[in-house]
């Protein structure tokens, strides 16, 4: 109704971009007339105009026209009008929803080029290394042609290479690499180790998968902490000897223990130490954990012992949580109590969620085939609008209504017979399954029906094999079973993907002769596993096999084509030597050879000539087959279960009917499917029973379809609430993380940190005064002796300070006096240190500040984790757990900042360097502190 009154809001948004499209199209002729070098000179001209005060929006029409022309010359691909609109949506920092096959990858070149003109860097994020590499090589050619630098981040890269790649105008990377690099940069001990520049603009491909499906996944860098095993064992022994209510009290509600004075005396006597809190030999932490293990953690209630390991039991579900460990040394204390082998503690050194990582970008945009269903979440959490880009040609896909069966068995038999029926007509079929086990079950049924098919699931076949299967999934009579449509990077082209087939044929001849044996590959020597499993990659200890499945190719290549191919391989071997290149480098050469970018390299040119010839021969067959398949009705997609999110169902449907091709989809469901069982089961089951239907009879009823959609909405809302909660809690951590990382970066970059340390020292003096002097009490009740002792504990150089020096001063005067004293002492300390080695004091300042920030931040992360766990229970006490978490988390953070200050001041005054070691050793020798 509202749509009829006001028009579709999405259409209004898209309409807004129309005048710009007209403007770009008017520029087309003019830009086409430019020579290559004139076109390339445009980049410098645009940069100049930005310097002269024009904005990116002013440049947009001309810049887009230039990219469109460059892409036409280099890749032979010209942006459609709808792709220009997609580019504008991305430039405006929104999410562009574009259907499968509408060329998302090409769209990103437009805003990436425009935003890279500022020189601040653009990140294009994909979901896996293979897609990042493919896009950097393929689309990167347009940017390189226009004079921009293009970087690529891959899993095994060394820091120097990463630094170089991040310094480029446009960098392609995966979400996890960007996240881990961000965390590592914030653990660096000098600016030389920092690889990333400040974030500027980011385009996320498959944005729903990164910002929604993986939003709850934290990225964690952790380190093993070596702690002395014998301390845990000794502490367990002491805890056994201490008596409850005499030596300690147990607070069951807070799950904590408090030691009495008698307890401290007894424990110190048993251990033969004078102070449990002695920083040189700390025992308190171990003793407290040992008492907790004895009193609060019971075997077979809180944990079980299985195969010599302590396994946690979840108190809410009663399930064992394999692989989870209590933190803070508690797990070790329980291992000691049970007399088991004590394992190392692991400690979180740094962590961030994708939600917060991407919110660090001043401007963020994304593309996907399916975002509209999650629009509310994108807007609420990421402030990102979703705009649907119209398709270039109207869709001809038919979505048939769902068919529901009573049992799972009946459903699978129906799926198999549908495959057989459609296969008999010659139409290609794609079946999406939700698990490996189900895909193998269907494969078995199809084998019994003698239907040839390809199986694609998460078994360790590598990405290349996956893309190979998808590349031929559109051929006449092809049947493909795929789990969760993992190969989202390659399009299903009706009649077969000639381009991809030709590339695989070149690969068969080229790779065996040029790739070095695995034992010589530098990646292997470094002990780095290549991130590709078996299949066509190396599986451990196996011989590499480059041959594609023989059925893949549509026809034999001609003698002339084979001659060209053998010649190209000979040229490569002559240039580089037999079996001399690492696999990645050879893959890169192949990728560049199969694109259209101009090249000077004779090897690539020879490979390209062969590739083009083979592709042309294959195209004769695939084009004819394309027409046949279109006439038959295109690809038929079968879904075998509804996913937890409608979005993933839509991704599967979107495989059919791409770019205006015909196609159809249908979902087969059963009452035993997870989604229906968990979220809608009883209501639907009662409908079914009321209908008294045989199990092999399908049901199609509007009532049932509605119940299904409600079940799906329920699941979506449930997961959205979880993500929102994770986000709200993590928001607290995020503000703290930003503050501490900003402080850390200031220290890393700061040339002169002396003023900062003096400020720390003055604040520490103020803290000491506040602890010993209550301005509301008369001066004779002030504990000046304690105050002076505490000051001298921090600053031994003030040994001459006496209580009488402070006796007649007011609090502000006392502060001013101690500020002056501590400054003088610091100058004195500096003179001592500089006499040993000039410049050493500055290094020491940086080292101690970074060391304390890192050390206390790690501990703070653990405290925040513990707080988050305990705060959940406050809900029962009518308190809002989130409000409590924010309040207490903030207090913990302030405490940490104070501790950092005090420890730095203490460490610097205590610092006694040995006689002139080389400067590097100063920082590494105290690294453990």
UniProtKB/Swiss-Prot annotation:
EC number assigned by the record: 7.4.2.8
Keyword presence, Metal-binding: no
Sorted UniProt keywords: ATP-binding, Cell inner membrane, Cell membrane, Cytoplasm, Membrane, Nucleotide-binding, Protein transport, Thylakoid, Translocase, Translocation, Transport
PROSITE patterns from the UniProt entry: SECA, SECA_MOTOR_DEAD
Gene Ontology BP, a term: protein targeting
GO terms, molecular function: ATP binding; protein-exporting ATPase activity
GO cellular component, one term: cell envelope Sec protein transport complex
Keyword Transport included in the entry's annotation: yes
Enzyme class: translocase
Bilayer disposition of the protein: Peripheral membrane protein
Subcellular location: Cell inner membrane; Cellular thylakoid membrane; Cytoplasm
Residues noted as binding ATP in the record, renumbered to the chain: 83, 101-105, 491
Catalytic activity: ATP + H2O + cellular proteinSide 1 = ADP + phosphate + cellular proteinSide 2
Function field: Part of the Sec protein translocase complex. Interacts with the SecYEG preprotein conducting channel. Has a central role in coupling the hydrolysis of ATP to the transfer of proteins into and across the cell membrane, serving as an ATP-driven molecular motor driving the stepwise translocation of polypeptide chains across the membrane.
Subunit-level organization: Monomer and homodimer. Part of the essential Sec protein translocation apparatus which comprises SecA, SecYEG and auxiliary proteins SecDF. Other proteins may also be involved.
Homology family: Belongs to the SecA family.
Name the UniProt record assigns to this protein: Protein translocase subunit SecA
Record organism: Thermosynechococcus vestitus (strain NIES-2133 / IAM M-273 / BP-1)
